[in-house]
Swiss-Prot record:
Organism: Sulfurisphaera tokodaii (strain DSM 16993 / JCM 10545 / NBRC 100140 / 7)
Active site: 97
Keywords noted in UniProt: Isomerase, Magnesium, Metal-binding, Phosphoprotein
Function of the molecule: Involved in the synthesis of UDP-N-acetylglucosamine (UDP-GlcNAc) and UDP-N-acetylgalactosamine (UDP-GalNAc). Catalyzes the conversion of glucosamine-6-phosphate to glucosamine-1-phosphate and of galactosamine-6-phosphate to galactosamine-1-phosphate.
Gene3D superfamilies linked: Alpha-D-Glucose-1,6-Bisphosphate, subunit A, domain 3, Alpha-D-phosphohexomutase, C-terminal domain
Record protein name field: Phosphoglucosamine/phosphogalactosamine mutase
Amino acid sequence: MGKLFGTDGVRGIVNKELTPELVLKLSKAIGTFFGKNSKILVGRDVRAGGDMLVKIVEGGLLSVGVEVYDGGMAPTPALQYAVKTLGYDGGVVITASHNPAPYNGIKVVDKDGIEIRREKENEIEDLFFTERFNTIEWSSLTTEVKREDRVISTYVNGILSHVDIEKIKKKNYKVLIDPANSVGALSTPLVARALGCKIYTINGNLDPLFSARQPEPTFDSLKETAEVVKTLKVDLGVAHDGDADRAIFIDSEGRVQWGDRSGTLLSYWASVKNPKAIKKIVTAVSSSSLVEEYLSKYNIQVDWTKVGSVDIAHKVADENALAGFEENGGFMYPPHQYVRDGAMSFALMLELLANENVSSAELFDRLPKYYLVKTKVDLKPGLMVEEIYKKILEVYSTSSVKAITIDGVKIIGKDFWFLVRKSGTEPIIRIMAEAKDENVANNLVNELKKIVEGK
């Protein structure tokens, strides 16, 4: 049987890999999985092809007897929160998150707002490939798609209920918001305004082509945003990806702070806010060693897991963990919801700053200093990924390092770590290394790239 779902949903280039025919068939499988008369919320980000795909999905769902509600354009976490709080049986989000502009995708959400478990993905794939759809009789096709207008307001109010609004308001923070010309522009400024912030925006208009910057917030794509933070002398900058489930922060000195750094600080803050919670967080093997180094001071256990928000979210929920996060800026705060949420992360960071009464630069300087270097190699036909992993283990495994092989190969040394893994969303192999010496990090990445390329 074939495979549709990757690390985070079904993705592909619109009209090439993610064709109308495939999406119609997939939506019929999704609707059959949820069952006749189930209530399903459909929404999307700003991407090209989004409106086309929404209409196809809604048509496919209607054809198998599902009651369909259209939530319009909204951040993925807003749609997930609406599914959970407004009584839906599930949701379908049209998004490719951080992928380049030509991509779009389908994310399936369960009634708890979390992306469906891997076993349920397999069930939908089985229905898709065997074409066992619960197609209804023509005489039952009398319902229309209904409009759901409460998505954004419900979401923003939910976020605000988890932070001390008055404490943040007293600080009169100046913030810069970079929503990547996508749906983060529809919600994060509303959160900032409610928290009494003076708001600046960059890349704030909706643009399906992501003309100003790539939808993935990286060190390179945020160079201009970081310069604006310094020029305007704001207290905090926040940048989202295409569907605003991530938040990458830029501190008051204009330094881009990667997601495992912000996730570490927010995990500490979650433990302060929820003193009775289990002192455990869940993060992917792609996160830095600084996570354990810092959180161990507060007796917070770190549970490493595979890369992918689906796996992390369900592990956080199953283990009743304090929080979960990825190094890419996706942070999960369980009192709100068990999914990545960019605007919730932003509100929590402002609350942490207000509580600590320090600048954002001073706050991030509390963390151990590591230098991060990343690259990627195209996954060419015939490239044997498992053989690459085996070679890396042969070269780098010694008694003085720790090897983790639950998702690619991660090696942790005294003052460095690296990860090599096949991407679950793109045909590439990702290489990342961190070290307390920048030259060590650069050398590691160069060495690993040669091994991956077979040189």
